[in-house]
Amino acid sequence: MIEIKDKKDCCGCNACVQVCPKQCISMHEDGEGFLYPKVNTDLCINCHLCEKVCPVITQDTPKEPIKVYATKNPDETIRLESSSGGIFTLLAEKVIDNNGIVFGAKFNEHWEVIHDYTITKEGITNFRGSKYVQSRIGNTFKDTENFLKEGRLVLFSGTPCQIAGLKKFLRKEYDNLITVDFICHGVPSPGVFRWYLCEELSKIAHKGDKKFSFALRPIYSIPKADAIAKECGFEIEKHTYDLENEVEFWENIETEHEKMFKEQGIKIKALIARK
């Protein structure tokens, strides 16, 4: 059974909870606001499925990219509402056009970041932009599997750890599944964000639709942001692909595609196709 002795050994993907046939695993929040699995040993039948779907315990061999593209969304408005050139929206709209399902992270009515799905292009808007908080996956791995078995085209967007957890949970390859992840520096605490909202939300004036966006100011550099990040993910020895190739490609974009790099709403534009 899953037994967390060191918090670094859990990425919080929730795969173990969703795969358990006896529903004896639940996620509990620690003092820092992160969720970790807890097993009800009275109900556990020692099937070890939770261990088999854990992306930390059972790691895959790193995979090489099939192709790498430098690309962007031609719509500047969408680029400015998005991250990394707005490519997610292009992919998601194509999936919706093919009667597919799109999963992503969004804010709920309580300003919590959760994973959800949409079957409409209007729903894609909620998934745009960076959300520097660990999302609550819920039962979206189960939902994804059900849609895949129905033959629906599915796009699932999440952190590298969440994508690894999803693929472990599915335990087979699906030709009708597209996964989208991103360069991740570690997920900040939902607990810290909750505290911030309690302290500051009353001071924030929203105009029109209620929206919340994140930005890292220079004073809050990546090393400082690590202070509220989960102890995992970026420290896992193996990745689902060769990250060095991705970073090298990204660094070459500025010189090899200067016009694209200077346009509004462009940060990282590397689209990597891999199996």
Task: Show the residue positions of the predicted features.
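Iron-sulfur cluster-binding cysteine motifs and their immediate structural context
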Residues: 2-4, 15-32, 36-38, 48-65
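Iron-sulfur-associated redox domains of electron-transfer enzymes in respiratory
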Residues: 55, 61-275
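General structural feature for long, well-ordered alpha-helical segments within catalytic domains
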Residues: 9-12, 16, 46, 50, ...
